[in-house]
Amino acid sequence: DGLYIMKNVDVYITGSNAYLLSGELATLLTGRYIEIKMYPLSFKEYLNYYKKDADEKMYLNYINRSSFPYALKLEEESEIDDYLDALYNTIIVKDIGLRKKIADTTMLRTVARFMFNNIGNCLSIKKIADTLTSDGRSISVHTVESYLESLVESYVFNKVSRFDIKGKQYLQSGEKYYATDVTMRYALLGRRNIDVGHI
């Protein structure tokens, strides 16, 4: 209450944990806050940090070393991989698991792996469920939808809907998902040859 009665005071709340992402905090602060979404560094910001011009080497560094600001301080690939593993465990396993009350996060991990392996492809929720089920991992369309919503809400992926120019409306299926930071895929898929055309 002390801050409430003081004039000229700004309070900043930062974070990305399950409580902040759940919307409960936003409900408590309704009408009294401005949300500023912070993303990992864009390629331009990455170049500005290193004071370099865009070239193939810098782009490959960007997609291999991570665009999270903390990763810029890390020297060794193993340190970056440890950091990405920690991010994965914090964001996907703990935050999403807690927020959605997922006791067994194995299937969430499977969906995340599928998404990181299909960055930029046109996907439907049914196609994802069918593909995972055909691989011996039975999962419902509803569960896939819930997990995808959680991954998007947690800023792991950005969803891009298809737009019908003639009909001037968004199509209901065939969305594309792009990773907010493509290096997070290394925590799930390991460091193997990546198709840079899809990221």
Which stretches of residues belong to each language-model region?
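Short connector loops at helix/strand junctions that flank enzyme active sites
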Residues: 6, 30-33, 172
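Conserved beta-strand termini and adjacent loop/short-helix elements that scaffold enzyme active sites
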Residues: 14, 38, 160-162
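Interdomain motor-coupling "hinge/lid" segment immediately C-terminal to the ATP-binding subdomain
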Residues: 16-18, 22-122
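Hydrophobic/aromatic beta-strand patches that form the interior of the parallel beta-sheet core
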Residues: 12, 34-36, 178
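Accessory nucleic acid-recognition modules appended to NTPase machines
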Residues: 77, 81-199
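Conserved catalytic/switch belt of AAA+ P-loop NTPases
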Residues: 1-13, 17-18, 26-28
